[in-house]
Every structure is written in C-alpha cells, then in structure tokens.
C-alpha cells in the first residue's frame, strides 16, 4: 500500500510482484520513459497496479518516451521502447492497471459502490463508484500496457486498463493495450473521457462499456488478434441510473481468421451514440 507521494523515475525498472495499491489521498507520479514489469501469478497472487478511490496517478509519458507496463518475461531494458522476445499471443503474463473513482455508476439494486472486477472480494481497496461526476484520479497519458490479463478466478481475468467510476476531471489519452488476455480497456460507469486509444490483440473484447458509462471515447483503434472476441462490447445500465456514452471516430480492424471476431455486441439496453465508425476485415458485422 503506497501512502503519501511516490515518484517512479525512468532510470529504474520497477517490478510489481503483488498488487501495488495507491491508497486514498496518496499520489504516484511516474516519469516519462519509465518501465514497470509485473510478475506472473493468479488469484490473490496476481500482480497489478491499483489506484484506489481518492488516490491519484500522474503517469505522463511522451510520444518518444512512453511509460510501459509489461511482464517480467519481456526483455525490454531501460531506454528501449520494446523488447524482442514476446508477441501478440503472449497474454496473461501479469495483471494490469486499475483506476477507481467516485463518479456515478448504475449498479443493480442502486447500491452506491461495488467491488471492481479483477480484484478479489476480500481486498477492500477494490471499491468504486460514488456521486461526484467531476472526480479527479489524475492523468494517464502516453502509456503502453502489454501482455497482461492474469486469471483471478473462473472467467475472471484482469483487463489491460480498468476504469471504475472514474470522473471527468481525470485525463486519459494516448493509451495502448497490447496482448491482454481479457478486455483491452473496460469502462465501468463513470464520466471520464478518453481519446487516442489503441487496443491490439486482446483475448476478449477491445473496448468494453458497462454500468451507464457516460463519457466520450474518440479517435481510437481496435485491432483484433487471433483470440479476440468483439471489437466493442457495450452493456446498458444495471440500476435506475440511465446515462449514455458517445463513440466518435473509431476504427475497428479484424484479422479475417478470428471466427468469433465481431464488430460489436450491444446488450442489456445499451444506451449511447456512435459516430463515424470505420470497420474492416471483420468476419461478423
């Protein structure tokens, strides 16, 4: 559990050998070009970086010096932008990144908070949701998340980037997720906007929207891999809170061999608008 202010710098490689949690009222600053590696593990032993409600992350890479989250199996070294030994089918080698906030979500039974998917129920830092649409969890820009998605239970893996109840004062842009065994990025409610996303070769869905997420996702690309499911999976509200998302300028690319690869799965009264969606090379539309 990180408390106070912590600074991770690009002259080190940081290793997550368990769930590292940025506690409420704590701040983690990550310098451009920093590499963070997660160890293998399943269930309660899965490694992940979790920003708890009330915590802050300022992870701001640059175009030439992105912040990289990857596996300890990746041979990438300080100063490099990629390793040479892992490919798009090397998935589930560590956990992922979870950012949790106090923004509204539509939960079954109209409860005010819920335990986030990907964190075991007995870990109290996994709660998300609230009543502040303008909540601020920091900024997460020019970040690459690779080879994650550790299994924590039956049909329960960690997404590359999980955003649970994140508010619209949080900045999310220029984020890529590569070779995650579950979804690339999943939005559980909240109001945060995101742009310039790239999801490649996820084992499940590219972008997943749930629980009346009401932000805007724009200028983004999903590229399906050999094991991918839907490019988009969008579910509606679970409680009485009804709100709607916006998707603007999204490109969806199939690989023409993924039998289950589909453009989108809209379910459970999904509510939102999609504008300028370009889809190609998908077996099922």
Sequence positions of predicted segments:
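Beta-strand/loop edge motif enriched in small/polar residues
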Residues: 1-282
